[in-house]
From Swiss-Prot:
Protein location: Mitochondrion
Main location: mitochondrion
Top-level taxon in the UniProt lineage: Eukaryota
Keywords from the named record: Meiosis, Mitochondrion
Organism: Schizosaccharomyces pombe (strain 972 / ATCC 24843)
GO biological process terms held by the UniProt record: meiotic cell cycle
Family indicated by similarity: Belongs to the UPF0300 family.
Presence of the UniProt keyword Mitochondrion in the record: yes
Name this protein carries in UniProt: Meiotically up-regulated gene 132 protein
GO cellular component, one term: mitochondrion
Function: Has a role in meiosis.
């Protein structure tokens, strides 16, 4: 993929040299035969596109992604640093892996004139787009969407407050977490902090399952990189043998080529003045170091990556491969990017928030039952302790009786189970 000649310049770098026009001879010199980039020839001002409207004046084509390197084989790691990990990281032709993509969603995220664009389409060829592929611009009507989101928060503060508490305490299911992470750029700072807390809990759960390392958790606690990238399996990340400015996210039914903001380079994070210096020193493998380099290089383009489509292709989120929306998970989210003249136009989005709250409450209830099962503590014992605590504080017992009655079957089931396990242990000891 991307066999460049000469220095590696992106289309945004070249376009920035001339504010009014693009010199196509420069593209021919630096991107011979690999890229097809076209702008509208009409001199009239181009109308700003809507969120789900394709852009007709920008296009980009790419081919030859049949083989690439896993991210852990990042070739920019110097020899002195490689020696610290006691492992061979020199990339050879034997390290090239075949593209696992068979069919599904194929997309390219790229910069142009300080804007992020996403070209996407459904195909069964990892080297070409179908004719019905389209290019979309990310971040359309950013100020308007922030305003509408604040309007929704002010209209239903109780719902948002409860969702905020679930996110901050790490008690939100994955579908709710992904839904709000894809709206991250439009939320106020307090809600963004709550989303980071929820993602931190998600990453720590992945660490317990052996799917992530402590470095991923440390980086998440320091809020390094884009929040959406922590939802992607690090083993699905690759890079091109000819360019370190492109990241490849690939699975059997999803492929995304992401244009990085800066070139992936290890030396920049190992400078003592770098804010990533201490974190880079804690890396225990080249795989961790390569991932950290990628997170510090990706920039804002990760916001346009359809993470919900990636999780859907992995059968993690929901079974559909093709998402309903391009940049967002729910179809009602598109109402945030329109000129709202009446609060009734946001009722669909507000209804979706209420459903998110119900999902959080159900997840919290199921988590409580699982936690009691895992630590060997019956569920009914939680209610007894809660009743004693409220009684000592002078709280009436009415709040305790209702959940105890509604969970009688569950309590009896766990009580019988733990008594059975206790009898087995006592027999073995005797």
């Amino acid at each position: 993929m991307l066999s460049f000649g000469g220095s590696l310049l992106s289309h945004s770098d070249i376009a920035s040299r001339n504010k009014f026009s693009i010199d196509y001879s420069q593209f021919k010199a630096f991107f011979p035969g690999n890229w097809k980039f076209s702008n509208s020839k009409d001199k009239k001002p181009v109308r700003s596109p809507t969120l789900d409207e394709p852009v007709g004046d920008v296009d980009i084509d790419i081919f030859d992604v049949s083989k690439f390197y896993p991210l852990k084989r990042l070739s920019s790691i110097p020899e002195k640093i490689r020696a610290n990990y006691h492992e061979e990281l020199q990339t050879t032709s034997y390290d090239l892996v075949r593209n696992p993509f068979t069919h599904g969603l194929f997309c390219v995220v790229f910069y142009h004139q300080n804007k992020s664009y996403l070209k996407m389409g459904v195909t069964d060829n990892f080297n070409a787009f179908e004719e019905d592929s389209r290019v979309y611009q990310y971040g359309v009507n950013h100020k308007l969407s922030c305003k509408n989101l604040l309007l929704a928060i002010n209209y239903s503060p109780k719902t948002y407050t409860k969702i905020f508490d679930f996110l901050r305490n790490g008690r939100a299911p994955l579908q709710v977490l992904v839904h709000h992470c894809m709206l991250y750029n439009f939320y106020p700072e307090d809600f963004q902090d709550a989303l980071w807390c929820a993602v931190q809990a998600h990453v720590m759960n992945q660490v317990r399952l052996g799917r992530a390392t402590l470095l991923h958790a440390r980086a998440c606690y320091q809020k390094i990189g884009d929040i959406r990238m922590y939802l992607i399996d690090p083993h699905d990340l690759y890079f091109s043998p000819n360019s370190l400015k492109w990241l490849i996210i690939c699975s059997k039914q999803f492929q995304a080529l992401v244009h990085l903001e800066v070139k992936m380079d290890t030396l920049k994070i190992f400078r003592r003045r770098s804010k990533y210096f201490n974190l880079a020193r804690s890396c225990v493998s080249g795989f961790e170091l390569s991932w950290l380099i990628m997170m510090t290089s990706i920039g804002s383009n990760a916001s346009a990556v359809p993470v919900h489509a990636y999780l859907a292709s992995k059968r993690i989120l929901y079974p559909s491969i093709i998402p309903e929306e391009i940049f967002f998970m729910r179809k009602f989210d598109s109402s945030l990017f329109k000129d709202i003249k009446n609060i009734h136009e946001l009722l669909g989005f507000l209804g979706r928030l209420f459903m998110d709250l119900q999902d959080c409450e159900k997840f919290h209830h199921d988590y409580t039952e699982y936690h009691c099962y895992r630590i060997g503590k019956p569920l009914y014992q939680n209610y007894e302790e809660e009743a004693l605590r409220k009684k000592s504080q002078g709280v009436k017992d009415a709040d305790f009786i209702k959940p105890l009655v509604t969970n009688t079957r569950t309590a009896e089931k766990y009580k019988a189970f733990f008594e059975y396990k206790r009898n087995i242990v006592l027999k073995k000891q005797s």
